[in-house]
Design a protein with these regions (language model features):
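Acidic, contiguous N-terminal accessory segments
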Residues: 2-91, 131-146
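Feature activates predominantly on carbohydrate-active enzymes
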Residues: 36-39, 43, 61, 82-176
């Protein structure tokens, strides 16, 4: 099911360097859901200068705008059918002033977060180099999206892992 043609909603992430929303996780998040929320908080913070708080879904105060990351109860109530999503499939859906970034297990929610960050111009170029734009005020129209990678196993190896790099043999080994 592809939702990109539907209209979305405007979400205010930050205004003048101040966060306008909280980030919610399921009360018992998976490792990838936790990583996704941490990345979202970190990179939104780098972009806007704001501090984005991550809380368990059950600790979210009423009346706040929230980004729900992972397989939350809120997403379930908004008709996200987790059991119909493949392992890497993601869903992005605005609901009023809230945003759902969710997906199949194990890693779909992580891909939802990075799809959104990429839409904002945020990219991890290499292991130690990021491209992060500067937006003290960040408001965006968020169109609904449900997608998945064309194929699994999308790794690019541009060198040997560090453990396989040149190492020097000990003198004892060389002498024998």
């Amino acid at each position: 099911m592809f939702l990109s043609c539907l209209s979305g909603g405007e979400i205010s992430f930050a205004e003048n360097g101040k966060a306008q929303c909280l980030i919610a996780l399921p009360d018992k998040p998976t490792g990838f859901e936790r990583d996704a929320a941490d990345d979202l908080s970190s990179y939104l913070g780098q972009m806007t200068g704001a501090k984005f708080t991550v809380l368990p879904e059950s600790k979210i105060p009423a009346g706040k705008s929230v980004i729900y990351v992972g397989q939350t109860n809120y997403a379930r109530k908004q008709n996200i059918r987790f059991n119909q999503l493949s392992a890497e499939e993601w869903v992005i859906k605005a609901t009023g002033s809230n945003l759902i970034l969710s997906g199949g297990k194990p890693i779909g929610s992580f891909y939802a977060v990075w799809t959104l960050l990429n839409q904002f111009g945020c990219y991890c170029l290499t292991w130690d180099q990021d491209a992060v734009p500067n937006h003290k005020t960040l408001k965006r129209e968020i169109r609904p999206e449900q997608s998945k990678p064309s194929f699994s196993g999308r790794f690019i190896y541009n060198r040997y892992p560090p453990i396989l790099k040149y190492t020097q043999a000990s003198a004892q080994v060389i002498q024998n």
